[in-house]
């Protein structure tokens, strides 16, 4: 697996967390740099940790499934990517309705609600739950890493940094531009993961070599 593929995988996996970060920016008022930093640290940290756990589990079973490991990687990435696209399309209308309702809250109540919401949205418990939820896909992808002979340390550092940067920007973007990019990010992430899964399958079955030989 090339560095480019790892970077693209990092972007694909990070899109879920990025979308949630944008949502955080939407719900928070007057976002501060430390708010964005906190969200980014939680999401980036878990996004790096989960592939490591998956890789460890995959290594344990690697000897038993070497003959079809590329199919496992392809199926996992394809399923995860498809799920991201499906959920983004499915939830679009529901989220628009929620935003419309929140816009009707009176100014005074909105300020009071915003202060309470900030504490809740940025609590360690809330961020941990969201960080785990958005990195489950990374856990599954980590299993496929065990069959690809890559440097796991380098890989999780790349994934963690990409997620950290995107989530930091996501909170800022969420405050400035609303929910325009949220579902599009999930769709893009899903497409990237599916394409990488196809690429891994083609590489390991020798189809690419045959096409260009």
Swiss-Prot record:
Main location: membrane
GO molecular function: manganese ion transmembrane transporter activity
Highest taxon listed in the record's lineage: Bacteria
Pfam families xref list: Mntp
Annotated compartments: Cell membrane
Keyword Ion transport: yes
Transmembrane parts of this sequence: 3-23, 36-56, 67-87, 130-150, 152-172, 187-207
Entry's Gene Ontology cellular component terms: plasma membrane
Membrane topology according to the record: Multi-pass membrane protein
Biological role stated in the UniProt entry: Probably functions as a manganese efflux pump.
Family: Belongs to the MntP (TC 9.B.29) family.
PANTHER family xref list: MANGANESE EFFLUX PUMP MNTP-RELATED
Name used for this protein in its record: Putative manganese efflux pump MntP
Gene symbol of the encoding locus: mntP
